[in-house]
């Protein structure tokens, strides 16, 4: 299959996101699509797969003009799109999610459970994973859910597979399994569009790379004929001399302390964070880092343990109590827990601080709009309009909206779970700079990250977890990748 996208433009109201795009895709090739968040990568692929139409332009498939009315039509034609955010039903089982809308039936019209199970297990085997078929998908980790999304697409007869940040929530082993599958698909003649910000993956797996910036294509070339410095410069329009901005904040006394905390999947977790300090939490997927943070914030139930702010013990059983105590929490899954996608930017940003903008029972629209506009400008959110629906923003700009929401409460402590997941290199640096600015003001920050270079580049101290327990603590000076991984795998 050969796809030619010609003169594709797209606007949402007055917001132009694509302008005169020409792109060729070919079966049997792995084609990287790179660019900062907001460059238009996902929008272009959404047009290809029928989620919404182009404002102008034409799509040719094997020389014939063709458009799809919805993603289902595209899938039936052999073009599938695995989105960055999960497209699953948490209450339904793994098997039900896999075959939703594509159920296999017997000659009597009944569900052919045996054949569906067989196909599901065969697909999981190709991916190199073992996941129970009869448990609710909501009980699985983000990484496992991502693997199911990938498996779902593999159940189709594929010609072109579009993958948007497919490894963002995967372990190293799962990533290697994915690469094996992608290489196998290529050998079978399937074309893969690989949207990613991870340079090492681009050079490891792709044949061609296209760079987008501000809704236009900057360049397309064979991956082997370019390098990471050139790609970064083309993505952001400048060279990133220093990936992690230098931190100048003075670290003060202990401001946030957790003692002997126990909950689901973790026990006896103790740590502290000082004013102006960024404390990194590292560990393999399933180590319990996210569960600890969710318990502190009152999402998950605490079994035992104490939490203190400024040496005062606090009681938290719900997120609303955590917010009242001054705790902000950016969750790892922004779509389901961090944002209301149908709401606009202003409504999302002011959700935790509504009372601050209310006087005598009335919401102060003028003050809140001014406040939100200041945050939009400060975080370089690409829209410029507080009334723009959050669902129309790129993943990176959505992440900035979640950050702005918690900055708005003037937090006493800020917990960030995978703050730069799915975010491009330019936006990552902006987020790191914002973290440094907050630390300069004395805000203690806890950062959970699966990105080891990020942990090493941003953290003042590093806590490492293994199988639900703290396995070690490292200072910034003594930490390196080998020491962190040794602790993360249970070594000493």
From Swiss-Prot:
Signal peptide: none annotated. It comes from the Bacteria. Belongs to the ABC transporter superfamily. Ribose importer (TC 3.A.1.2.1) family. It comes from Streptococcus agalactiae serotype V (strain ATCC BAA-611 / 2603 V/R). The gene is rbsA. Residues 3-239, 238-492 form the ABC transporter domain. ATP binds at residues 35-42. It holds the Pfam family ABC_tran. This is Ribose import ATP-binding protein RbsA. Part of the ABC transporter complex RbsABC involved in ribose import. Responsible for energy coupling to the transport system. It is found in: Cell membrane. It catalyses: D-ribose(out) + ATP + H2O = D-ribose(in) + ADP + phosphate + H(+). Gene3D superfamilies: P-loop containing nucleotide triphosphate hydrolases.
